[in-house]
């Protein structure tokens, strides 16, 4: 079929990453580029320029001078630019810096311990063969060896480790296969990272004892070095180590000691070569990707430096011509800058050489500029170069060359340049980069895009194609004798007449385009279709005709955003001649999330038979009826069809013969064959058919001929109460639902009772269409939808019509009067709400209430304000409900079903009861972000209200309705709410989009294999059975006990469609059933015992008394008494039979059936829960069968086997890409979540993070410090526990000073000391609340507070004052001293490491002082920053993170100093606050014993700080204290009172570590009993363990996943992840199947630790291409190159990059062709 040159005959197996060496590149290069001008004055490429023709032609007019081919055939050739001086390789600059920092510049050895080096080498060797366990074994061997031998030599250590390693390498069977697995990759990168982090920062060299040289990097372009102050030389030893004839690398000169200088690349290179001689064996393993591909492949240190730069071929950086202007490519500009620098350096070196008559070598010689002996050389350029002497100029331009070379690689490396052109990194990265734009997704042919419009006359699985598309989209059809007639006609019709053809492909692959105008040419081609072309030696297959799309061809349709699998489905084409747009059936709208307000959709036309087959069978719309998220139906009829269907099937709707026939015909237009009809329901006076009969006629004609029609008992959406006009008469045993219109009964395909509405043909579960899908398959259910749509449309068009009028929304006069009265009442409820919220007395005056409310609003702690908000909402909700009761539904002028608006709402067509209430009753309370509208600074909510007005109207309670209009202020509130919705939508798309992308990139490789395990693309098992039971979510819908009766009533059909008899004849369920019986038997036997006893334990209990009676003498050995020894001996001497008796009794419960018998090959091996469901149902069924009179033919066993078969048929198919489905099922609903469902806690509630922020916290960040950590523990239901839990709650609650402080009086005065010193004196008097005020809630006494003031608070206050004054010179010296101590560059390193650990809090702005209440400056700044960040779209968000990462990496020490200065006092304060945070309250101080003790206390406070002059306190009650503070007079003044107040709010008098607040809430548990639950804000699990008699610790729960993992292990954390994600969605009423959540959780915890789904989590992936196509491609590329990684091309991303078929779905297997 395909011409030979198109048939692929080779396949990529893998990709390895590495670096070309300088020699290889020199060989590859065809030209040295020396001319900085790339085009001459005529616009032609200049010789030796960057567009020289030797590099290949830059555009189509030229010819390559190397291979003499034109633009289309020449793939381009590399060139190079020679650099006059060596520069650092920007790719490896950071690693070079670490190498230099971790090595000794004197003896050229690494400064890490030798043991670490040999250990790492051996560990990397064993990892290369995938021996993970050996890594830990080696660590053990080393530590044991170091313990046993004192001061071992490096050689001994090496021998010891090598011995074990060689054993492992010999016994290895896998070869290098095992090395490309996630766990091994993770282990390797961990070991290497750990080595760099811990061993490369020694203070002095262990070999020559020289102090460490401090190396620092600046602007990524130069290294500066501070040499150590003294050097230890060991004479004679140094040269002995070097091999013969090797030049000794220079050590450190005497002159350089203690100096700081610039380390040039050439001296760095010398040093590196010297290290390499000493440490080469080790560096080979550390940089395995930098091997020289030579005879002996080994690490090549010259890789760290560049002597020339490679120039890519011209075609990859084309010149863009616009008119007569030329615009060059950014890459070319960057290369040009390097060349200009090179020219300048060469000139400068010539000048220096002439002046000095020296070789161009770097020595610190200042050159006297006066002796102007160089007459020949042009020196005018020197004035352009910065620097004094020539050497300075040389260094400066050398650094400039370095930064220009950097820019070629990465334009962000130079932070100082303003005009930037993209470097290599910019070309690869981000959404617009090569990986994501051109490799992961490509533009395609044979696709169409147009606006969609609705059409309910085509089938649900069809798509209407306009003629414009039909003549352009073609399919390559091979010509055969049986289709030649059709194809001839197509060729004759030509490209413009449908059905025609556009082109014919001959046997040799040449193409003949069919002319639109020349009919004779087309006829000639048509006649030769079957005759082989002349001149071809052997005919290679047949001709191929590219024919137009025709009816019935399959197309893939897609609407963006493609959030989940149903966003791409296959439809059959239906050509519509007169149209210009795509036409889509209404039923598919929900799957695509499409509406017809201008949406566009894409259509793709598959070009191979394989693709078409997949589309027809798997991707077809009929097969996509259920959504993978939770198995709910997607397709369903909408709006008009609901109203029409409900009206048509209502009792009393009759049709004459003509009408009946017309409707049946309209419903079944495309049925072939006889139509079965029903006899009329009414015969006299003339025959009439009911609407129900019309629907039944459709059903029995659609259901396939050879299947029994279905039986179904269900409910309609319209409830039974809606039909009741007046109270029914009392009848004994009256069941209101029985035979009512809300009960739908279908027997043998005939609708006998009930109205069909949204519940049956909308997108709702267990309706008529869903049941048809389940029993007869997708094709039938699709036809049911199609036919019903046509029928209902016809009914509306021909007989009924549908309209709304004002009459439908009018309210009766008496209801209106009631409504008015309630509205008047509601205006008075304001003061009542505020009083209730703030616990004010009834008698409080309005002014007092207003004052309190005003305070609550402007207080930093918003809890009171939230409380008032809640009370207001409760009040107005009460009034809203009253009004709604008065008006709806009996207050309406017309009632259901005559009321068309009610009909529309009830049947589910459109709208909700809320809409009808807004029209007829009132709009209700307007809420913004979960609160009432905020107040302006003036205290008004809108300018037309009074400040702090109480009326609900002023708080956004709208009493108007749309029927009678709303007032301007109410309209304004209404608009505010509308705007909020829009803003939310705009913001959340990007956030959830990025979240979904992260999950998809991680989980893309998870596929079900043929052994039913879920594995990642590298073969690592993530789950042994998908979702823990192996079931496919859409198939599980009818495996619920509620649906068993439906399956039983349709037994015949299901048995036939599932081939039950065949299965039973081949499968034997007995083995499995025996297993289930064994499990039941065990449970029956061990029902009472909670603890399982071992065999020896039961034996020893039995003989214990007998042994004790022996009174054995002797002493305890190894912790075992003589009695125990005797028992052990008796147990060992016991004969086999007796021992087996004990062992049998103590045998553990057999494993569950699923884990023993693989469910797909063992019939009846089902999950335990399902087995239990079947048992329960069987008993129920048997009981019912006894009661009922008519015996059912269905026996219990047959029902059981049917259910088991149904379960087995529901197993997930191998090849299912469950990872992608899980990712889509979490990502797609997250777009529907409003960004933050705001949940503002009042005083009695917990604050919780919800919505997308919480999802990001769990999935993307996996941060150890979550925003709202909490624990909850149920309290035992005993009197003692309930009494003690009250005091426990008090004990766990944190107390701040502000909560117990009544007031602070401050007096300020001046005083003059001697020597004219001026002072400012403050007298601060602190008055505390009396104990009675807080003893109920707080675990404190006044003495404790006073003790806190004396020991901690005054110190904090002085620190804060010092901080305020730090601008003035008096204290500057203190701070600078602190900073310089920490100035050493290892703090930069530890700082960076700390920062990297904290990086996972990218979005949790790090507030330094952990104790700060909700509003210190840092907190508000970070909040503001977060607000700004939230508005960025997700692409730029990703960029921001990358830049941040870069900044962190390049953090210079200067920054570190600044950070230390600002953070230090805070850190100190934080640590100080913690000191007091013991569980027990601070030591209780008894009343002072006399004057002496009192004097001591006062003295201690005075001496605690130089500023404190005097101190006094209340010796009687401990209710006040007074301190006098004397400060030197400053130019700057600050407000002491605000400082004291803010400190008092943040100073913690008493706390339990980690817990801020405690609440006791009453809940209902699973057994429907009331119980108390203790909830804490903050986490401290060990603390709660102390109260095991009060709290039921077995049911303790915490939302901090890390805390649970660290305390209870990773399996517990797994469950927490599942529960947390489920809870986030539950708030919005979204159900996601637990199988998806378990898969995501299993993946995140795969490595035994909880890892996030972000770029730090993907570092352990074994596929470098998967990492690169995710984020920070350059970073991952660098990593892969240095480590010499290999990609097996198994992950989906890697397959897409190289164009392989992804190993999933139908790509999981390959078919062998039988050749005979």
UniProtKB/Swiss-Prot annotation:
Binding site for RNA: 559, 599
Binding site for Zn(2+) 2: 104, 107, 205, 208
Catalyses which reaction(s): RNA(n) + a ribonucleoside 5'-triphosphate = RNA(n+1) + diphosphate
Residues the record lists as binding Mg(2+) 1: 595, 597, 599
Post-translation changes: Phosphorylated.
InterPro entries in alphabetical order: DNA-dir_RNA_pol1_lsu_C, DNA-dir_RNA_pol1_lsu_N, DNA-dir_RpoC_beta_prime, RNA_pol_asu, RNA_pol_N, RNA_pol_Rpb1_1, RNA_pol_Rpb1_3, RNA_pol_Rpb1_3_sf
Xref: SMART domains: RPOLA_N
Binding site for DNA nontemplate strand: 436
Compartment annotation: Nucleus, Nucleolus; Chromosome
Entry GO MF terms: chromatin binding; DNA binding; DNA-directed RNA polymerase activity; DNA/RNA hybrid binding; magnesium ion binding; zinc ion binding
UniProt superkingdom: Eukaryota
Residue ranges, annotated region (Involved in RRN3 binding to Pol I complex): 475-549
GO BP: any one term: rRNA transcription
Key word Nucleotidyltransferase present: yes
Cofactor list: Mg(2+)
Region (Clamp): 110-201, 327-433
Location of the region described as Bridging helix in the Swiss-Prot/TrEMBL record: 967-1008
Binding-site positions, Mg(2+) 2: 595, 597
The protein's assembly and partners: Component of the RNA polymerase I (Pol I) complex consisting of 13 subunits: a ten-subunit catalytic core composed of POLR1A/RPA1, POLR1B/RPA2, POLR1C/RPAC1, POLR1D/RPAC2, POLR1H/RPA12, POLR2E/RPABC1, POLR2F/RPABC2, POLR2H/RPABC3, POLR2K/RPABC4 and POLR2L/RPABC5; a mobile stalk subunit POLR1F/RPA43 protruding from the core and additional subunits homologous to general transcription factors POLR1E/RPA49 and POLR1G/RPA34. Part of Pol I pre-initiation complex (PIC), in which Pol I core assembles with RRN3 and promoter-bound UTBF and SL1/TIF-IB complex.
Domain notes: The clamps form the DNA-binding cleft. The bridging helix crosses the cleft near the catalytic site and is thought to promote polymerase translocation by acting as a ratchet that moves the DNA-RNA hybrid through the active site.
Protein name: DNA-directed RNA polymerase I subunit RPA1
């Amino acid at each position: 079929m395909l011409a030979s040159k198109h048939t692929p005959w080779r396949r990529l197996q893998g990709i390895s990453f590495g670096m070309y060496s300088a020699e290889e590149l020199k060989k590859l290069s065809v030209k040295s580029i020396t001319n900085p001008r790339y085009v001459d004055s005529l616009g032609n490429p200049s010789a030796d320029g960057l567009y020289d023709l030797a590099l290949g032609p830059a555009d189509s007019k030229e010819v390559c001078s190397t291979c003499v081919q034109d633009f289309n055939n020449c793939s381009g050739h590399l060139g190079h630019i020679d650099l006059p001086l060596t520069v650092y390789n920007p790719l490896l600059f950071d690693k070079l810096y670490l190498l230099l920092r971790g090595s000794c510049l004197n003896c050229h050895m690494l400064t890490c311990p030798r043991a670490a080096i040999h250990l790492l080498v051996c560990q990397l060797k064993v990892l290369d063969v995938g021996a993970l366990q050996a890594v830990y074994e080696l660590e053990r061997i080393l530590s044991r060896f170091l313990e046993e031998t004192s001061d071992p030599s490096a050689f001994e250590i090496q021998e010891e480790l090598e011995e074990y390693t060689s054993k492992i390498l010999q016994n290895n069977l896998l070869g290098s296969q095992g090395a490309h697995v996630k766990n091994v990759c993770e282990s390797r990168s961990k070991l290497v990272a750990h080595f760099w982090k811990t061993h490369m920062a020694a203070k002095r060299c262990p070999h020559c004892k020289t102090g460490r040289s401090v190396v620092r990097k600046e602007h990524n372009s130069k290294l500066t070095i501070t040499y150590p102050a003294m050097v230890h030389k060991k004479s004679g030893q140094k040269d002995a180590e070097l091999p013969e004839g090797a030049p000794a690398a220079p050590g450190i000169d005497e002159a350089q000691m203690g100096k700081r200088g610039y380390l040039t690349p050439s001296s760095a290179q010398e040093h590196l070569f010297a290290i390499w001689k000493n440490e080469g064996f080790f560096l080979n393993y550390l940089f395995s990707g930098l091997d020289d591909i030579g005879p002996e492949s080994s690490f090549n240190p010259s890789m760290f430096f560049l002597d020339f730069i490679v120039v890519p071929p011209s075609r990859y950086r084309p010149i863009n011509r616009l008119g007569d202007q030329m615009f060059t490519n950014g890459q070319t500009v960057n290369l040009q800058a390097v060349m200009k620098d090179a020219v300048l350096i060469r000139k400068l070196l010539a000048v220096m050489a002439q002046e000095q008559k020296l070789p161009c070598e770097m020595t610190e010689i200042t050159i006297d500029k006066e002796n102007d002996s160089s007459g020949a050389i042009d020196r005018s350029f020197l004035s352009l170069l910065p620097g004094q002497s020539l050497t300075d100029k040389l260094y400066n331009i050398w650094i400039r060359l370095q930064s220009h070379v950097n820019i070629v690689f990465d334009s962000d490396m130079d932070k100082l340049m303003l005009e930037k052109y993209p470097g290599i990194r910019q070309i690869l990265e981000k959404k617009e980069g090569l990986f994501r734009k051109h490799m992961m997704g490509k533009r395609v042919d044979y696709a169409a895009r147009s606006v969609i419009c609705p059409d309910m006359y085509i089938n649900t699985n069809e798509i209407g194609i306009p003629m414009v598309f039909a003549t352009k989209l073609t399919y390559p059809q091979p010509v055969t004798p049986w289709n030649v007639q059709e194809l001839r006609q197509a060729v004759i019709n030509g490209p413009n007449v449908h059905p025609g053809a556009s082109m014919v492909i001959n046997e040799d692959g040449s193409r003949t385009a069919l002319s639109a105008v020349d009919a004779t040419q087309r006829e000639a081609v048509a006649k030769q279709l079957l005759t082989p072309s002349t001149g071809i030696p052997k005919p290679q297959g047949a001709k191929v005709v590219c024919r137009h799309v025709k009816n019935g061809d399959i197309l893939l349709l897609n609407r963006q955003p493609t959030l989940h699998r149903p966003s791409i489905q296959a439809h059959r084409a239906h050509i519509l001649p007169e149209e210009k747009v795509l036409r889509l059936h209404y039923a598919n709208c929900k799957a695509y999330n499409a509406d017809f307000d201008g949406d566009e959709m894409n259509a793709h036309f598959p070009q191979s038979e394989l693709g078409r087959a997949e589309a027809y069978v798997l991707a077809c719309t009929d097969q996509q009826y259920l959504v993978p998220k939770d198995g709910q139906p997607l397709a369903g009829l909408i709006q008009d069809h609901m109203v029409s269907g409900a009206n048509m099937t209502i009792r009393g709707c009759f049709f004459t013969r003509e009408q009946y026939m017309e409707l049946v015909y309209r419903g079944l237009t495309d049925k072939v064959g006889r139509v079965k009809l029903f006899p009329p329901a009414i015969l006299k006076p003339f025959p009439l058919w009911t609407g129900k009969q019309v629907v039944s006629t459709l059903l029995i004609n659609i259901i396939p001929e050879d299947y029994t029609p279905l039986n179904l008992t269900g409910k309609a959406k319209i409830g039974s109460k809606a039909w009741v006009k007046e109270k029914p008469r009392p009848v004994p045993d009256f069941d209101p639902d029985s035979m009512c219109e809300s009960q739908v009964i279908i027997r043998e395909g005939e609708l006998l009772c009930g109205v069909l509405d949204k519940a049956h043909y909308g997108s709702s579960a267990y309706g008529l269409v869903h049941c048809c899908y389940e029993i007869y398959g997708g094709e039938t259910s699709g036809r049911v939808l199609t036919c019903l749509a046509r029928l209902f449309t016809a009914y509306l068009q021909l007989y009924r019509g549908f309209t709304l009028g004002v009459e439908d929304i009018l309210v009766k006069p008496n209801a209106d009067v009631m409504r008015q009265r309630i509205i008047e009442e509601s205006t008075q409820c304001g003061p009542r709400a505020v009083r209730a919220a703030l616990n004010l007395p009834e008698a409080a005056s309005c002014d007092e209430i207003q004052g309190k409310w005003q305070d609550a609003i402007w207080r930093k702690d918003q809890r009171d304000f939230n409380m008032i908000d809640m009370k207001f909402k409760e009040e107005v909700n009460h009034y809203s409900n009253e009004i709604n009761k008065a008006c709806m539904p009996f207050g309406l002028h017309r009632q259901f079903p005559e009321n068309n608006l009610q009909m529309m709402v009830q049947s589910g067509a459109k709208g909700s009861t809320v809409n009808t209430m807004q029209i007829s009753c009132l709009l209700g309370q307007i809420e913004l972000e979960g609160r009432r509208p905020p107040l302006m600074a003036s205290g008004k909510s809108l300018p037309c209200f009074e400040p702090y007005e109480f009326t609900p109207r002023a708080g956004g309670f709208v009493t108007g309705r749309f029927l009678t209009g709303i007032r301007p202020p109410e309209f304004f509130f209404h608009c505010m709410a509308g705007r909020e919705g829009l803003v939310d939508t705009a913001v959340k798309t990007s956030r959830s989009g990025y979240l979904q992308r992260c999950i998809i990139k991680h989980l893309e490789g998870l596929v079900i294999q043929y052994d039913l395990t879920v594995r990642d693309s590298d073969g690592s098992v993530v789950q042994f059975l998908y979702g823990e039971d192996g079931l496919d979510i859409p198939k599980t819908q009818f495996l619920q006990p509620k649906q068993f009766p439906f399956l039983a009533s349709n037994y015949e059909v299901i048995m036939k469609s599932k081939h039950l008899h065949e299965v039973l004849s081949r499968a034997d369920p007995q083995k499995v059933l025996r297993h289930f019986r064994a499990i039941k038997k065990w449970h029956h036997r061990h029902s009472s015992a909670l603890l399982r006893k071992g065999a020896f334990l039961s034996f020893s209990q039995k003989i214990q008394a007998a042994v004790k009676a022996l009174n054995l003498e002797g002493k305890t050995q190894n912790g075992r008494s003589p009695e125990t020894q005797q028992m052990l001996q008796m147990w060992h001497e016991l004969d086999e039979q007796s021992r087996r008796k004990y062992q049998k009794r103590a045998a553990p419960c057999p494993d569950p059936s699923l884990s023993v018998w693989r469910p797909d090959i063992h019939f009846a091996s089902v999950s335990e829960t399902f087995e239990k469901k079947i048992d329960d149902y069987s008993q129920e069924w048997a009981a019912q069968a006894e009661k009922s009179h008519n015996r059912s033919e269905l026996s219990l066993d047959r029902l059981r086997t049917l259910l088991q078969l149904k379960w087995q048929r529901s197993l997930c198919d191998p090849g299912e890409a469950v990872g992608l489905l899980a990712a889509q099922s979490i990502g797609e609903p997250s777009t529907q979540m409003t960004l933050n469902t705001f949940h503002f806690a009042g005083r009695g509630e917990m604050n919780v993070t919800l919505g997308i922020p919480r999802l990001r916290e769990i999935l993307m960040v996996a941060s150890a410090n979550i925003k709202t950590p909490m624990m909850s523990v149920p309290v035992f239901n005993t009197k003692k526990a309930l009494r003690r839990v009250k005091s426990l709650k008090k004990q766990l609650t944190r107390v701040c000073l502000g909560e117990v402080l009544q007031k602070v009086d401050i007096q300020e005065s001046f005083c003059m000391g001697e020597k004219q010193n001026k002072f400012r004196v403050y007298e601060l008097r602190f008055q505390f609340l009396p104990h009675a005020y807080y003893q109920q809630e707080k675990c404190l006494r006044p003495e404790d507070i006073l003790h806190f003031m004396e020991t901690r608070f005054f110190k904090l206050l002085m620190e804060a004052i010092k901080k305020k004054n730090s601008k003035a010179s008096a204290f500057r010296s203190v701070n600078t001293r602190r900073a310089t101590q920490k100035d050493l560059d290892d703090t930069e390193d530890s700082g960076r490491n700390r920062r990297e650990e904290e990086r996972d809090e990218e979005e949790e702005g790090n507030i330094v002082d952990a104790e700060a209440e909700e509003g210190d400056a840092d907190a508000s700044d970070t909040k503001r920053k977060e607000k700004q960040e939230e508005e960025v779209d997700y692409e730029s968000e990703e960029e921001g993170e990358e830049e941040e990462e870069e900044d962190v990496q390049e953090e210079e020490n200067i920054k570190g100093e600044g950070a230390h200065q600002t953070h230090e006092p805070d850190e100190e304060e934080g640590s100080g606050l913690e000191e007091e945070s013991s569980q027990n309250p601070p030591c209780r101080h008894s009343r002072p014993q006399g004057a002496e003790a009192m004097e001591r206390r006062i003295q201690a406070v005075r001496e605690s700080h130089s500023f404190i002059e005097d101190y006094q306190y209340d010796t009687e009650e401990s209710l006040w204290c007074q301190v006098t503070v004397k400060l030197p007079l400053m130019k700057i003044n600050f407000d002491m009172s605000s400082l004291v107040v803010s400190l008092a709010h943040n100073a913690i008098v008493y706390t339990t570590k980690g817990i801020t607040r405690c609440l006791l809430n009453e809940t209902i548990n699973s057994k429907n009993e009331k119980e108390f639950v203790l909830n804490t804000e903050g986490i401290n699990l060990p603390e709660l363990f102390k109260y095991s008699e009060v709290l039921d610790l077995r049911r303790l729960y915490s939302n901090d996943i890390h805390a649970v993992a660290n305390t209870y292990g990773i399996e517990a954390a797994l469950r927490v992840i599942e529960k947390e994600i489920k809870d986030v969605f539950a708030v919005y009423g979204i159900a996601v199947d637990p199988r998806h959540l378990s898969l995501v959780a299993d993946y995140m915890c795969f490595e035994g630790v909880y890892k996030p789904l972000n770029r730090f989590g993907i570092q352990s992936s074994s596929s470098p291409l998967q990492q690169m196509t995710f984020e920070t491609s350059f970073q991952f590329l660098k990593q892969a190159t240095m480590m010499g990684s290999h990609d097996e091309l198994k992950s989906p991303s890697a397959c897409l990059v190289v164009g392989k078929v992804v190993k999933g779905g139908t790509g999981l297997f390959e078919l062998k062709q039988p050749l005979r």
